[in-house]
A protein has these predicted regions:
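Short amphipathic alpha-helical interaction segments
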Residues: 25-38
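N-terminal amphipathic/basic helix or basic patch
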Residues: 2-6, 28-31
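Nucleic-acid-binding surface
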Residues: 3-6, 13-22, 37, 45, ...
């Protein structure tokens, strides 16, 4: 059984990222992923996510796959809309109040919180520079968020 061929197909159909749960659905166990990682046949991004050695990591896609309760906002949304030509040093996401993003998300992103009833307002899908779709706020919502948070922006 050629695990690398299976993982290559998984990566190709999921934006270059191999998730543990998806590989298990294809008959590749966590232990096998661990062994392949030790052999340098795949690289671990964060818990539950891997990439092939020759692939470039799409950081935005990786972050968005870690939680369905975050949406790219503020500076990151401006970048995705093409308004800012500078890649943000720290990505910004918005989560509903009461939702606690993982430590991995908090360490890589600035997290803003919003009332749950306003969380989905203005949600759309945008393409990353690598060509993958991620959730982000539309331009109108992004501009409102930037103005509302202008004293907190870095």
């Amino acid at each position: 059984m050629d695990y690398i061929a299976k993982l290559t197909a998984i990566a190709k159909s999921h934006g270059g990222i191999i998730e543990t749960r998806i590989s298990e659905q294809h008959g590749i166990s966590k232990a096998m992923l661990y062994n392949l990682c030790k052999e340098d046949k795949i690289h671990r991004i964060v818990k539950g996510q891997y990439i092939l050695p020759d692939d470039m990591q799409d950081e935005l896609l990786s972050i968005s796959k870690r939680s369905d309760r975050i949406i790219f906002s503020h500076e990151t949304a401006l970048f995705l809309h093409g308004i800012s030509d500078r890649t943000p040093f720290e990505h910004t996401v918005t989560a509903p109040s009461g939702c606690i993003p993982s430590a991995a998300i908090k360490s890589e992103c600035k997290v803003y919180y919003i009332k749950p009833e306003l969380f989905e307002l203005g949600k759309t899908t945008l393409r990353t520079p690598s060509g993958n779709n991620v959730p982000a706020y539309d331009l109108e919502r992004t501009i409102c968020d930037v103005i509302r948070s202008r004293n907190k922006l870095g």
